[in-house]
């Protein structure tokens, strides 16, 4: 009897994991085309989340466009043209729904709270008014976070799965 070949349960195929993105972003490396920040100032969670989602969308669109151009070039017996890949990537990105890639904001905040519990990020003390406070003044401000020394020294495998690092 033959056993069917199928992927293992769980997980999603991502260009970069959420934890790895957070670390690289807060280090100021600007992963996936995101803006480079000052590591000492840090960034608020909403900005990190937005850059993560946009980066995943850009990477996915570029990957899809590359595959389409490869197929077209193979069928047409021609070489791959990078200009076509860029045009296709822009078309795919313009049609892609914002919610189609990555996690939702609440899941991201829970993920950050795990990273904070591990002591890998800390608030910088810098706060600014949030858009929510325009309508509800007692609402929470935008708090900036940065990496701690423990966060910089944590292993790559721990950053890939902070829940395992936290709960074992």
Protein language model features and the residues they cover:
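Short alpha-helical segments that sit at the start of domains
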Residues: 1-83
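Residue-level marker of regulatory loop/turn positions in helix-turn-helix DNA-binding domains and
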Residues: 14, 18, 100, 104, ...
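Short, solvent-exposed secondary-structure capping/transition elements
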Residues: 61, 120, 156-157
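Intrinsically disordered, low-complexity acidic Ser/Thr-rich regulatory segments
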Residues: 77-106
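Short amphipathic alpha-helical interaction segments
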Residues: 99-125
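Residue-level detector of family-conserved "landmark" positions at structurally sensitive sites
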Residues: 125-126, 165
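Accessory beta->alpha helical hairpin/"wing" motif in late/C-terminal subdomains of nucleic-acid enzymes
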Residues: 126-140, 144-152
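Amphipathic alpha-helical dimerization/coiled-coil segments
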Residues: 146-168
